[in-house]
């Protein structure tokens, strides 16, 4: 069974500024296949190698695979669809498989616009792919595919989605095959060294309304830190990796395991060989302020903070549990620990104005992070915030959903003015940094790293790839009214996808009604219990029982403590700083407290909606 994986040839002016990133997904899938006994797999990185459709066709003809598989995030979905169309034309007997976050949630749309796709893998891919390959090897695949969990496909005119596959419980069993990667192609520009993107955990327990990772991975699972360091040691010693970024949404959530990870890195002497970076939350930085220098000793040199917005209003919209003041304090703490800070700002919401854009610049300069990024709000079509803002979304050309193209149009700005405002922030921030900070502050590694970051920005700017400025035709303030983002206006939401959204909205409304009924019922029962307690209080007091127990003072079984009453419908919910998780059936749905504001909609949806 020969399997060929293809990374789609999609480019934007965002993350590529810092270098070429190795597609970790293929290493993890190949590791699962290898463990299951499938070793005849190949990889074509059409993105890094700029492989055209014609060249891809040649490679597929040469390899003659039994299965061609690719993946897609939202902006690369059309290229991924075209990749499998090429496969259909040159190796028509090969099974064509698509995975990734976009296809997982938008499979109806994808199958409607690209019916040549044979199978979509939904959700976490390792176990689902192995089961799919086994089913494809067996006879009568048209029938056996219906028994494989985590798939979607067309059967005639019917869009079929099988039951959701459970998440991988034993994350320590994950063993990626990094040997599938051609490492000389993946360089981290600021340091000029090979870069990797391993992960320490799967999932995220928070429910930020603009993000979809918590929906895709579902529950939060952390690997054994020693096994993660085993993997990193292999990347360093066998593949020459000199820098890595933990792919986790927030690796510091589990403080104990993150500390163990750092201790293991130090014990093996790895900080002298490899540096690394993470994304994390401001609250975790403040929590661990006494440990930041220890983290730096373990090789952690770069932290990207989701400050998200200068205006507190925006933080509230995004369901962030931080304040503007906390953002500034976290950056100060990291600076004192000699850890490079990168502040992330989201711009382009409906309430954006010239004044709010200017405010983000002023705060960025006041906070003094080493780096600052302004990303366009991108309404992933499968997030809660997209559903709330759907009437305001005018662009459904997903190839532009890349954080650098203004998908949303603020009421007070044109898209060209929004882009110009963002570029004005970049120009001022990095011009000042280049003249007064980077060359003169610090020595050795700090100076080299900052100048390397500046070089990466300049390289992208001169090449007109930064923020896709060349494609948009932006040359400065004088061109803001002439920019063209080349939106494909023929792209619309598919009928099947729209019908599913409407059905989901109806289910959500019914769930909300049930929650309200339960709330009223619970309140009434509480009042009844309180009334009963008040009526019985004199008798119980006279009896002398410590909790209102037996008259002779003997134990009534409650241990002298208030006993919790459990209604028919009881959901365990605790304000643990956003870290409480709730399990329902085979799902473990993360629940974020948001400072006491629990979000139940997703969990309720799991209860009332059959698994697809």
Curated annotation (Swiss-Prot):
Enzyme class: oxidoreductase
GO biological-process terms attached to the record: light-independent bacteriochlorophyll biosynthetic process; photosynthesis
Keyword Iron included in the entry's annotation: yes
Domain B12-binding: 9-143
N-terminal signal peptide: none
PROSITE patterns the UniProt entry points to: B12_BINDING (PS51332), RADICAL_SAM (PS51918)
Binding-site residues, [4Fe-4S] cluster: 204, 208, 211
Protein name: Anaerobic magnesium-protoporphyrin IX monomethyl ester cyclase
